[in-house]
Every structure is written in structure tokens, then in C-alpha cells.
Amino acid sequence: MNGQINISRFIAKLDSCFDRNDMKAAKECIEYWEKEARETGDDRALLTVLNEAVGFYRRTQKRGKALAAMGESLTLVDKLGLPDKLSGATIYINAATTLSFFGKEEEGLQLYDKAARCYEIERHTETYEYAALLNNKAGTLNALKRYDEAERDWVQAGDKILKEIGGHAGEIAISLVMLAHLTFDRDTTSYEKVEKILDEAWEYINSDDQTKDGNYAYVLRKCAPSFDYFKRHDEAEAMREVAKEIYNKR
């Protein structure tokens, strides 16, 4: 059976699940729409659903399911003729992040580089999406102790792209928190420099242009453990409380 499904409806429903932090509903949503996409033969819709599944299973630490969905999504990129397109880059970034998360950093770097080439071909390098690529790639480089390259990418993402285009205070905060880890990993005596970076991250976390939505709650939950790690427990607890309040209201 060939047809098309309403993929924007799927995204809206899945976003609603994540805004409530309802992982059970998110899983059911993904499974339902994956089945619909397969039954209708809508490969483009299936690619979107599988890409969301990759992120979901990574988030819930389901290694086998994440890698299986990732493998099929990469096959669909080729089948649909998207290897040099921005839509293909999105799949590569998600796959690379997943490989890195599950300890396959070198394989992940190869896909980050493929994604970067897509952005370069499309002249799309001064964008939020490209900054997100650099942020994720920097995390992988840091895990491999390639500190100079990681710092280069985090600085480019935060200082040279996100600050320039504006409106992404949460993502800048995440970049700074990761930069604090890099600084400490490279030199465990660099307390003063780490504190300065975290102070700047805290300012961005509390920026007036932050919309107090599910994405903001995600930023808070992502940053809180790092503040705990660096013994800034009061700020970490404050972030967790605000995130909890946001999720409870939705």
C-alpha cells in the first residue's frame, strides 16, 4: 500500500509527550507512527519517525534499538537520494551523536564530517543547525581527548555562531558547560577558569529571552549534573526544581 501520512501531526504529538516528559507516551507515539509509515509505504515519513526513534532510544539508553533504527535511517538516506542534502545532514548528526553516546566515537566523527560537508555544500554554516553539529562533534572530540579541536568547535558554535544570530541562550549555556568540562579535563588545576565559564553559563541559563517551555526544562536538566559535578549544588538544585515545575504544568 502506497500513501502519505501527516508527519507534522506526528511531530506535534511527540513534542507534546516530551514537553510533559512522558516517555511512555513518547514510545507509544513513535511505535504507532512507525507502523503507519511502514503500512503506507511512505519512506520519507518513515525516515522522520526512525530519526526521532534514534534520539528517543538514545535518551532512554536502549542501545540495540537505537542502533537498529539508526542503521535503517542511514539506508533510507541513500535510498531517497539525500546524502548531500540538509535533510541528510540531520540524519547523520543524530546517528553520529548516537554512535558517540554508545562508545563508537571514531565512527561518529566520520558521520559528523559527512554532515558538515552537506552544510558547506548548501552554504548553511552560519546557522543554529550547524552550531548544534559543532557542539555535538566537540563532545565526541573531548571524549577522545582531542581537546584543542573540541575547544575550537565549542568556541565556534557559541561565540561565532549562536551569539551572533541570537535567541539561543540555552544552547549557548550548554556549550559553555561542556567547555568547562573540557577545561577541567585538560588541566585539573584550572578551577578559576572553570568557575568563570560556569558563571557565564549561569547568566545565559537565567537570560530574559529564555522561553520557559519544555526545551528550557531540557536545558536545565542537561546542565544541572555538571553544576553538581563542580560543587555548585544550589544552582543545580534550582535548575532541577524549575524543570520539574515546567513539566508538572504541561
Question: How should each PLM-predicted stretch be described?
Answer:
Residues I11-N21, A45-R59, L86-F101, Y128-A143, ...:
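Conserved alpha-helical positions within TPR/SEL1-like repeat arrays
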Residues M23, D43, R63, M70, ...:
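TPR-repeat structural position
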Residues E31-E36, L74-K79, D113-I121, V155-K163, ...:
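Amphipathic alpha-helical segments of tetratricopeptide repeats
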Residues G81, A96, R123, I165, ...:
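Short coil/turn linking the two alpha-helices of tandem helical-hairpin repeats
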